[in-house]
Every structure is written in C-alpha cells, then in structure tokens.
Amino acid sequence: IDAFDMKNQILDKRIGTIITQVYNPLIASEVKLRLLEYYNDETEIYYVRAAGIVSEESIRKIPIYELDMQEDIDYLTSIYIPKDMNNKKDFNDLVEIIDTLRGENGCPWDMEQTHESIKNQLLEEAYEVIDSINNDDIDGMIEELGDVLLHVVFHASLGKEDGYFNIYDILESICNKMIYRHPHVFGEGEVNNS
C-alpha cells in the first residue's frame, strides 16, 4: 500500500501488509493514525529502511505508537505489519462469523433462520438503539448498533446463499445512494441550506 493512499484503503489484519512511501515524520504520523483505527497502539510492526541495500538496510520491530518518532525516516522507509488474528475484531470478522454459524458445522438455530423468521428481531434491535439514544447510553448504543449490524450481515448471508445479493451489493447500494443524495459534496451541485 502506498502511504499516500492510506485513507482510501481498508486494511485486512488477517494478511501481512507492506506500506511504502513513509518518507517523513508527517507521513509516518498519518500512517500511524490510520493504523490505530485497526490495531492497538502496542501492536508491533517492522520498521524497514533501505530494504535490499546491503550497507544501509535496517529492519527493527517497533510498536505502532512509535512509528513517527523514528529519527531515520527518509525516502527509503517502509513498514511491514504482520497478519494479526488476535487483534480487534472488524467487519470482515463479523461476516466470517455469520458464514461459519450458517455453514455446514455451524449452529442449528442460525442455520434454520430465514429473512422472515428474524425480521421482527431486527425491528426490536432498532427500537433498542432508539432507547439507548434516548437514555444517552453510549455503551448501549455500541451494543445495540452492533445488533442491528449483525442483522444486516445475517440478511446478507441469507441473500448470498439464495443467490440474490451479498453484503457487497448492500454496501454498493448505500454508497451510491449517499453519493446521489449529496451532489453538492460528490459532484457539481450546490446547496443553499441544510
């Protein structure tokens, strides 16, 4: 991954990742902040300088939080993040968990569910989100929004199994809708009020 393109990348912690063009402390700081969205600040990464140049090559392990504090950052600097299966869970993990639960050796209850059988639970979870908002309960919001997201991913898994749609169809649909509804941000339109 090019450090200049970090903001446009979705990192997958389940694979090793090389980030290039980490050539000054400002870029290193931006990369660090992006990595902290996916990894703990103590996660060890490899700081690589002058890879392949025998007399100058340097590779050392550092915690992510120290990335922009390295004194030898220059145009020959890259970093390598090893795969990390024990870190914070992310969206890909949720999709994989649901696929496992509905898979051949999964949970009998999850395997027998249909769009119809779980539709009322989705509505209940949405009401629980509203209750959490009304009670200014941040932890409750995190939990209940997670439950709503679980239902979205579960319905996407059902759609994939039926051959009608998958999670990426849902994501594409909502992204296109948000871009369409905001031409003043993503296009040529102007807006005079909110």
Predicted regions and their residues:
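Long, charge-dense
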Residues: 1-3
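A contiguous loop/helix-start segment that scaffolds small-molecule binding in enzyme catalytic cores
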Residues: 5-88
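Short, amphipathic alpha-helical segments
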Residues: 22-29, 165-168, 172, 191-192
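Extended low-complexity intrinsically disordered regions
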Residues: 61-141, 191-194
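An amphipathic alpha-helical micro-motif enriched in hydrophobic residues
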Residues: 122-130, 134, 138-164, 168-176
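Acidic catalytic motifs of isoprenoid enzymes
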Residues: 155-158, 172-194
